């Protein structure tokens, strides 16, 4: 899995600049180096309409000044940023501002790199289910949760033949809960989780055959199957016999 993530980040590094532009100024970034615990990122700011010299400011969230550079030609200002894996999304939000004799440009759109730099594929998908009896017959209640994966994560209830029966996007870290009448599907069903990086599926859960569903309805309604009932009756008889012998031996 670690190798897969490194390959993903290497692909991001090989791609061109990701760019946002507003009010005459452009902010872009490119991943230069990928390390197991950090990234080296090049952020560029460009205000092509500003007269030279141009003073570029790289701002973090809440307008905090990160770096400043004066440019005397038409080349965009470049800023090298080292980012560690412990960096929070707040610290990976940047914007640019430029000032010159012709005025002030920006701030630019906010550049948020967290999802792209630290994205993790969905994994460790757990699916738990219970059978319940309702007014309209037996239903399957399924709970799906991926232990790992970058948000947002979309969960799907998939039925026989790959048909999507239901879909949810709960809050991150919360499970998706599905309820499905047994009469609406046959064969099997499973849970599927997907984010921007990948897809993961749970093991297939087989559904009872048609002839077994009538028995299932009776069981879920509170009636004991025949075999357990006989065992319980036999146990009660045995207890009664033992109790009678004990009373006889004490002379009561």
Swiss-Prot record:
Q: Which GO terms describe its molecular function?
A: cytokine activity
Q: Name one Pfam family in it.
A: Ig_C17orf99
Q: Which residues form the signal peptide?
A: 1-18
Q: Would you say which domain of life the source belongs to?
A: Eukaryota
Q: Which residues are glycosylated?
A: 82, 177
| Inducers of expression | Up-regulated in the mammary gland upon the onset of lactation. Up-regulated in peripheral blood lymphocyte B cells upon activation.
Null mutant phenotype reads: Mice are viable and reproduce normally. Show reduced number of both peripheral lymphocyte B cells in the spleen and precursor and mature lymphocyte B cells in the bone marrow. Show smaller and fewer Peyer's patches, lower numbers of immunoglobulin/IgA-secreting B cells and an altered gut microbiome. Exhibit reduced levels of immunoglobulin/IgA in the serum, gut, feces, and lactating mammary gland.
Entry comment describing in which tissues the protein is expressed:
Expressed in bone marrow, spleen and lymph node.
Q: Name one GO biological process term.
A: adaptive immune response
What is the documented function of this protein?
Answer: Probable B cell-associated cytokine that plays a role in the regulation of humoral immune responses. Involved in lymphocyte B cell development and immunoglobulin/IgA production.
**Stated name of the protein:** Protein IL-40
């Amino acid at each position: 899995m670690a190798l897969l993530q490194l390959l993903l980040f290497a692909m991001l590094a090989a791609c061109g600049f990701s760019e946002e532009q507003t009010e005459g100024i452009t902010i872009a970034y490119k991943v230069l180096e990928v390390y197991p615990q950090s990234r080296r990122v090049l952020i560029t700011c460009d205000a092509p309409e500003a007269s030279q010299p141009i003073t570029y400011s790289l701002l973090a969230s809440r307008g905090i000044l990160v770096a400043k550079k004066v440019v005397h030609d038409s080349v965009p200002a470049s800023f090298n940023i080292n980012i560690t894996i412990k960096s929070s999304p707040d610290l990976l939000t940047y914007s640019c501002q430029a000032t010159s004799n012709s005025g002030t440009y920006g701030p630019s759109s906010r550049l948020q790199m967290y999802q792209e730099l630290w994205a993790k594929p969905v994994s460790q998908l757990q699916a738990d289910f219970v059978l319940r009896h309702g007014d309209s017959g037996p239903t399957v209640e399924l709970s799906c949760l991926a232990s790992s994966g970058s948000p947002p994560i979309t969960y799907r209830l998939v039925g026989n033949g790959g048909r999507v029966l239901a879909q949810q996007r709960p809050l991150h870290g919360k499970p998706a809960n599905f309820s499905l009448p047994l009469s609406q599907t046959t064969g099997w069903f499973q849970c599927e989780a997907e984010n921007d990086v990948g897809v993961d599926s749970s093991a297939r859960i087989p559904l009872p055959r048609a002839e077994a569903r009538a028995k299932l309805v009776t069981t879920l309604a509170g009636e004991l199957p025949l075999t357990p009932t006989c065992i319980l009756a036999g146990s009660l008889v045995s207890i009664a016999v033992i109790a009678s012998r004990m009373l006889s031996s004490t002379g009561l």
